[in-house]
Amino acid sequence: MKQLILASSSPRRKQLLELANLRFQILASHIDEQIHETKSPEQAVQLLAYRKAKAVADHYPHSYVIGADTVVVYQDNILGKPKTEEEAAAMLRMLSGNEHHVLTGVAILSPNGQSLFVEKTKVFFWDLTEEEIFDYIATGEPMDKAGAYGIQGRAALFVKRIEGDYFNVVGLPLSRTVREVKRLGW
């Protein structure tokens, strides 16, 4: 069987690939994840996903390498992972009662070519109270997640509805990713 590598240390992406019953290994890429303001959100996540995959694929050229990057976009503003609890609260206030998009760029590099795509999911939040925001932040859950929330955790209670791929919001559009890996011959 050809080697499949996830170029990410994200526990959520690992869990999703395990859900798909794929045999893979994890080799986190250590790249500068700075998003340049001149890029559109779509270009930024695609470029970061490619850089992550390329950093690993350069050392494993005969393997299939998956890189991914996820951001939350609200009114053309990219919301990455909050650096402080105050920043997390500000992000959640922004998203409260509003719709936003979750974008995941995926790069699959293989000996048979590559697949690069961006998946977009629209998420609608209920109005959040300050108590809900602070109780959620106190769990520590939002601190390692783009947009300061994890739809698969307690923040599921904030979500009114979504349009698109649920797993994309978690961190990897699973169905499309698996189909692309197989299309490339894995």
Swiss-Prot record:
Principal subcellular localization: cytoplasm
SUPFAM superfamilies: ITPase-like
Annotated Gene Ontology cellular component terms: cytoplasm
Active site (catalytic residues): D69 (proton acceptor)
Superkingdom per UniProt: Bacteria
Record's subcellular location: Cytoplasm
Positions of the record's site feature: Important for substrate specificity: R12, T70, Q152
Required co-factors: a divalent metal cation
Catalytic activity: dTTP + H2O = dTMP + diphosphate + H(+); UTP + H2O = UMP + diphosphate + H(+)
Xref: InterPro entries: ITPase-like_fam, Maf-like
GO BP term, pick one: nucleotide metabolic process
Assigned keywords, A-Z: Cytoplasm, Hydrolase, Nucleotide metabolism
Pfam families given in the database record: Maf
Family: Belongs to the Maf family. YhdE subfamily.
Record function comment: Nucleoside triphosphate pyrophosphatase that hydrolyzes dTTP and UTP. May have a dual role in cell division arrest and in preventing the incorporation of modified nucleotides into cellular nucleic acids.
UniProt-recorded name of the protein: dTTP/UTP pyrophosphatase
Origin species: Geobacillus sp. (strain WCH70)
